């Protein structure tokens, strides 16, 4: 088994010529390699809808973890329920932070997402994912190379130094148009915020709509240097 500790540049070959640009092949390899020791960390963005549909074909009882920061859009929570109905066999876990919002306010002051967004992300996303990955050998992410400069070198199989794990990224070669084409073709549910200018959807407090021609992640932490929550730093 390929693990963080036994990592070497792997020579596993995945064909990119099929409809899924290698995604199904990558997922089939991952679930064969890691069996029950792999989890998909899903934010329920539009890429997530594609991956959930593909994962359901490969492993209908797969583990899916949603990092519930308690400050997501209501539309996101409603979408999760729709996904549960569409894919009832998937094991969707809504992972909570250890601190409630009130406890966080008492320890760090009100509106931590404004005063110290990095700490807020650490408490409400990074630490919960660390806990979720503690007993796993690998995790799946919906990163695409097209999304941003920080993601353009992502590979199918990555050694993840941040979480000392293997990170599997099946959608690296997909374009934004291809993601949506797949969603429409298979009549997949998606967050209606995508229809009103939100290409990337995170917490309600830190996500704004993006103007025409803007980068897909321009609405995340708008006005701040921050562009990532920290889950995908190496």
From Swiss-Prot:
InterPro entries: APS_reductase, PAPS/APS_Rdtase, PAPS_reduct_dom, Rossmann-like_a/b/a_fold. It catalyses: [thioredoxin]-disulfide + sulfite + AMP + 2 H(+) = adenosine 5'-phosphosulfate + [thioredoxin]-dithiol. Binds 1 [4Fe-4S] cluster per subunit. GO terms for molecular function: 4 iron, 4 sulfur cluster binding; adenylyl-sulfate reductase (thioredoxin) activity; metal ion binding; phosphoadenylyl-sulfate reductase (thioredoxin) activity. Keywords: Cytoplasm, Iron, Iron-sulfur, Metal-binding, Oxidoreductase. The active site is at 229 (nucleophile). One of its GO terms (biological process) is cysteine biosynthetic process. [4Fe-4S] cluster binds at residues 120-121, 203, 206. Disulfide bonds: none annotated. Pathway: Sulfur metabolism; hydrogen sulfide biosynthesis; sulfite from sulfate. Its main location: cytoplasm. It is found in: Cytoplasm. Its EC number is 1.8.4.10. It holds the Pfam family PAPS_reduct. Its cofactor is [4Fe-4S] cluster. One of its GO terms (cellular component) is cytoplasm. Belongs to the PAPS reductase family. CysH subfamily. HAMAP family: CysH. Catalyzes the formation of sulfite from adenosine 5'-phosphosulfate (APS) using thioredoxin as an electron donor. This is Adenosine 5'-phosphosulfate reductase.
